């Protein structure tokens, strides 16, 4: 039986393993090695003597398989949100960017613009009202001066509508009327008896104002004591005339029916010595009280003319006064000459 068996040598098991990066290649290598090992084991069963050797080879093959190390890498995909275009489940705005800021800025700008317009309108209305009030006040003051300091006289004010339409019309008309007024005479130092009733009556019949050596025309400043010289005699005469006028207005029956006999003589207007043309009109005699050349025309020409011609002393006094007037010149004469040259 032993001679009939042919002893054959055991096939040599040669295993080769390779480490791959991916887990799939390692598993394929292991499966190939396992298949080859199974085929070797199945072939060993035919020979009993070689069992131990084959078992050692199988065990060495299994230890070799256990030493295989595998590596694997995980790749994470990127996450992208779904598109909102034509997606009913995602809400998207159709307005442009910054709409909220534009709306808020427009509201704030409108508020500031309204406040600015309101301020401009109120400022303009206030300016117009102030201008009208100023013109009205100036017109009232002007009219009160023209009416003698009484702003409540009849016809001193115009209609309010005419004031607003043309506030300067009344000024023009008043200036025109005042420029057409006649010149009033002034009273300086009257004769020896300044309290004569006949002379006072003559002065009452004429319009008189306070003595003003600078201005010849009456204006609204005539009642003010702005001049350098004020005649005390004139002050007394005015006070007496005002008292007499008040009595006459209270009792109109006391008015004289006929003027006095020497009315024409008394109606002679008093003249100033400063005017050159007035010197030629009437002779100037020396004052008997203050020894000055300021004098009116003689009051009684009819009765005193003959005495003046007959008495040589009076003629001498007149000559002396004329000589004094020729050589002496008062400061007011220089001032009057300057004013007349300006006019």
Swiss-Prot record:
Biased composition (Polar residues): 254-264
Transmembrane segments annotated in the record for this chain: 101-121
Keyword terms of this UniProt record: Membrane, Transmembrane, Transmembrane helix, Vacuole
Basic residues biased stretches: 281-290
InterPro entries assigned to the protein according to its UniProt record, in alphabetical order: PRM
Location in the cell: Vacuole membrane
GO-annotated cellular components: cellular bud neck; fungal-type vacuole; vacuolar membrane
Chain segments carrying region Disordered: 45-65, 235-343
Residue stretches of biased makeup (Basic and acidic residues): 269-280
Membrane topology of the entry: Single-pass membrane protein
Family of this protein: Belongs to the PRM5 family.
The protein, known as: Vacuolar membrane protein Kpol_1003p17
Lineage of producing organism: Eukaryota, Fungi, Dikarya, Ascomycota, Saccharomycotina
């Amino acid at each position: 039986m032993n001679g009939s068996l042919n002893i054959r040598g055991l096939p040599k098991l040669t295993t080769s393993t390779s480490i791959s990066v991916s887990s799939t290649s390692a598993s394929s290598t292991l499966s190939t090695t396992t298949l080859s090992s199974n085929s070797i084991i199945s072939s060993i069963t035919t020979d009993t003597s070689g069992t131990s050797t084959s078992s050692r080879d199988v065990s060495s093959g299994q230890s070799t398989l256990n030493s295989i190390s595998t590596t694997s890498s995980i790749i994470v995909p990127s996450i992208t949100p779904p598109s909102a275009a034509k997606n009913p489940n995602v809400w998207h705005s159709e307005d442009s960017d910054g709409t909220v800021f534009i709306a808020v800025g427009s509201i704030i700008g409108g508020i500031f613009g309204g406040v600015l317009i309101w301020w401009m309108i109120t400022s303009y209305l206030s300016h117009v009202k102030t201008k009208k009030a100023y013109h009205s006040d100036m017109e009232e003051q002007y009219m009160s001066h023209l009416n003698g300091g009484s702003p409540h006289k009849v016809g001193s004010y115009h209609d309010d509508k005419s004031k607003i339409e043309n506030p300067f019309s009344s000024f023009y008309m008043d200036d025109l009327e005042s420029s057409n007024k006649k010149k009033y005479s002034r009273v300086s130092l009257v004769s020896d008896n300044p309290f004569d009733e006949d002379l006072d009556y003559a002065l009452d019949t004429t319009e008189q104002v306070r003595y003003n050596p600078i201005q010849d025309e009456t204006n609204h400043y005539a009642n003010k004591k702005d001049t350098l010289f004020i005649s005390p005699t004139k002050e007394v005469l005015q006070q007496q005339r005002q008292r007499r006028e008040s009595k006459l207005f209270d009792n109109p029956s006391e008015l004289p029916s006929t003027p006095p006999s020497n009315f024409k003589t008394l109606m002679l207007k008093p003249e100033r010595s400063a005017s050159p043309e007035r010197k030629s009109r009437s002779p100037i005699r020396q004052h008997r009280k203050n020894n000055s050349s300021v004098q009116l025309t003689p009051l009684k020409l009819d009765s005193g003319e003959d005495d003046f011609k007959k008495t040589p002393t009076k003629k001498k006094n007149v000559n002396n006064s004329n000589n004094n007037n020729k050589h002496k010149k008062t400061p007011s004469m220089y001032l009057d000459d300057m004013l007349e040259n300006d006019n």
